[in-house]
Amino acid sequence: MASMASLIHRNLQRKQKPFFLFLFQTRLFTDSATPSQSIEKILVANRGEIACRIMRTAKRLGIQTVAVYSDADRDALHVKSADEAILIGPPPARLSYLKASSIVEAAIRTGAQAIHPGYGFLSESADFAQICEDKGLKFIGPPASAIRDMGDKSASKRIMGAAGVPLVPGYHGSEQDIDLMKSEADKIGYPILIKPTHGGGGKGMRIVHSPNEFVESFLGAQREAAASFGINTILLEKYITQPRHIEVQIFGDKQGNVLHLYERDCSVQRRHQKIIEEAPAPNVSSDFRSHLGQAAVSAAKAVGYHSAGTVEFIVDTISGQFYFMEMNTRLQVEHPVTEMIVGQDLVEWQIRVANGEPLPISQSQVPLSGHAFEARIYAENVSKGFLPATGVLHHYRPVSLSSTVRVETGVEQGDTVSMHYDPMIAKLVVWGENRVAALVKLKDCLSKFQVAGLPTNINFLQKLANHWAFENGNVETHFIEHFKDDLFVAPSNQLSSNDAARLSATVVAACVISREHSLLKENPPGNSSLSIWYSSPPFRVHHCAKRTMELEWENEYDSSASNLLTLSITHKPEGTCLIETGQEIFPAVEVKATHLGNNDFRVEADGVSMDVSLAIYVKDQTKHIHIWHGSHNHQFRQKIGHELSDDDEAQHKPSFDTASHPRGTVVAPMAGLVVKVLVKDGSKVEEGQPILVLEAMKMEHVVKAPCAGGVHGLLVTAGQQVSDGSVLFSVKDVTSTVNSMLENLRLLMFSDENHGLMPYVAVNVKQPYLRIK
């Protein structure tokens, strides 16, 4: 076995080619498991992409799988992917995916010998791992004792401190009295980081810059931690202002062997959640990598660890010192980038280690080949502070898979991204022979990844991948904040951006017309003898057929401005369309579009040929058209008319639009649950004062007063569901209230009993006696 691993290692160093597919088909483990220990059926206690990913490996190993699902996930992809599926409760996670008794009961009912927890939910619950063991079920993960020691971030820091691993200054005690915590925060010194002692994913984390913010931040972190992990204990740490987030993948077996599989850089984050990860970490020396790996292995051995785990470190970019942050006692979301560079299936390792088999290779035999990136594709409103989004995936076409491109997903076209769970749509994972090659592939795949129906972060990921600092590997956890002017502000060449949108609009028009003609040829209306009028180009006597099409460009940089494009289209005899925008600075373009089927087209414009894809659907009584061509993608809206004909969306979803509401009106920025109302209707508030707290996808969002004044129409209560765009309350300032009263008085003075205006007599209506500005 060792010779086989060495041979693979030598070949990798020589050829530098992706090899994980070969290794996934090669048995490297020994047959130490007895027949009574063998796992033949696994219940996956999770949902979404990780459940699908676990099932894929299990099926390759010939192991049957059982899915669990809530009412909201009845038709989910992970349910369809399993051999069996069991309903475990209503949509809220605390009543389904976090309900250990229901999951264990489902495993016993279906005859599963083991439970794989995935990540999140119960994956880091020592109690759940212990229940599995007590019921005779294999928990595919570390022992309950290790989860308890390392899953509790306070306890893990005490263990690491005793082992001599550097720690960030902070408070890791069990006493949670708010006055004590506030005192400890003062001792540490601001800014401080508040975070839950259990769980991960950035949930419950708060950066606090001053004592005035502490109480509300602390209570909010407790609520979010309780909702996400069922435990609300908190720890405090000094906030390092320029850190890198580097983590080490470790793996242990039940024979006491532990090794590391190198590090991942996860520094690029928003809302304390990673969005682009890579392995190995850029700009890291071999000595630093070795010291980091050794520290991670020592941490795992200190608690008798086996299975997959991740030791996370904060690296101070100023001093170069690394500090232990926490240990995640589970498989990480970003584990695929490690699999890509070491050529191992970590889920297979988990299953075999749970079966009692030793690790297949030693530390010296762990290969390191090439570079890998993972980009997390989320349903979220980037321009609204990355707030999670909900809606229907009207169009979903990931990139093509290959030996160097993976897509981990738990959704398919037509699915709904709900408010109950994490808004991740997919993980795009790419491999290259080096970082430059891998980054080129990442950019290309992002430009071809098609999602329509709800807002996503794909364009933002493209900006990140193309940023000069990211290209150079100069990353740290404040990357997005530091380069916000580059990432969020419109391109300096606004004219070029408008030109690209107009080109896309002309291509859309040509493709829509080509699609119409294809449909009319297949199903001519009325008497077939009239089909000449529906030919391509349409037949006309003594002139060319013309039409007008209006498209409204959805500009991600300026959603408030009107970007209405009026296109004049002339059908030419040779089958092309002459498309004019009505502006002299944009000349007419002659375009020919050939419908290839579905929503794919081949377009020729000004001597240039391009492949084009469209997505067309109806939402909010408006046609939405998305176009992808080359590295460009744009979105347009169109009033419903005869030009297009698609089925309407099944459910109406209010848009986030406050333009039609009076000044001071506050609408829900996302669909969610009201978890706390902080003031009463009629209360006087200051600008920026928190009014209520919304929770969606296990993340809290504080809704604040837009101005000083009185709160009116605050009718929502804690526990109430609200839809995206629904009115929550309004704040009326004194000025607007007085002006409104004067206006009403003026109308009353000049109206008769029949509410008709009386003749203008003594008072100048246009000049009231008093007007407060």
Where are these regions (language model features)?
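Structured functional modules or segments
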Residues: 657-758, 763
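Short flexible coil/turn linkers enriched for glycine and charged/polar residues
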Residues: 186-188, 199-201, 227-231, 242-244, ...
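Glycine-rich adenosyl-nucleotide cofactor-binding module
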Residues: 602, 606-611, 617-698, 702-705
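N-terminal non-catalytic structural scaffold regions of very large proteins
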Residues: 312, 564-569, 573, 593-598, ...
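A generic structural motif
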Residues: 69, 240, 328-331, 381, ...
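N-terminal beta-alpha lobe that positions the nucleotide/phosphoryl donor
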Residues: 2-311, 315-335
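Catalytic cores of soluble metabolic enzymes centered on carboxylation/carboxyl-transfer
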Residues: 296, 336-587, 690, 720-773
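Structured core elements
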Residues: 43-44, 87, 116, 193, ...
